[in-house]
Regions:
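Positively charged n-region of N-terminal signal peptides that target proteins for export
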Residues: 1-4
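Bacterial N-terminal signal peptides
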Residues: 7-15
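Short, surface-exposed beta-strand/loop patches at domain edges
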Residues: 123
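Short S/T/G/P-rich N-terminal loop/turn motif that feeds into the first structured element of a domain
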Residues: 19-120, 130-149
């Protein structure tokens, strides 16, 4: 499957303890990157964010996390302009959900996350599904030869 890839959610938006990395200064098309990063990046590349959420073993947190995504989390991100490329269940670590988001560039990513974090529907959803988790996030730009741009 050519278009299958990954992504997941922001650390500052959760009430539970999280570990999230800061995004790079630039992400997306080669023209927006430093020369050392742009060499293999496409001119029409988007910014991709791969996120891994590992839920605690308590209270069935992974099931609550999946329900939160099913119920509204994906829709809230899409409402604010993100493309949710895919969402996966890790088989080697059943308490981890992996997902991938796509944006035009870093500025668009920041705009999407600001809208998401301030969305009243997100506040209600977060309270309904109070999941304790840790977050790993990776930012990528597609290569100039990638099928997914």
């Amino acid at each position: 499957m050519k278009r299958a890839i990954l992504a997941l959610i922001v650390g500052f938006a959760f009430s539970a303890p999280v570990q999230a990395q800061r995004p790079p200064e630039a992400c997306g098309p080669a023209a927006q990157l430093s020369a050392d990063l742009a060499a293999n990046v496409g001119t029409n590349a988007r910014c991709f964010e791969l996120r891994m959420y590992t839920a605690s073993n308590e209270r069935g947190d992974i099931d609550m996390l999946h329900q939160r995504f099913r119920e509204q989390e994906v829709a809230i991100f899409e409402k604010h302009g993100a493309e949710v490329v895919a969402v996966w269940q890790r088989l080697d670590d059943p308490n981890t959900l992996v997902w991938m988001l796509a944006y035009r560039d870093r500025a668009h990513r920041d705009e999407v996350w600001a809208g998401f974090a301030s969305d009243p529907d997100w506040a209600v959803l977060r309270e309904k599904y109070d999941v304790s988790l840790s977050i790993q996030a990776y930012w990528m730009s597609s290569t100039d030869y990638s099928n997914l741009r």
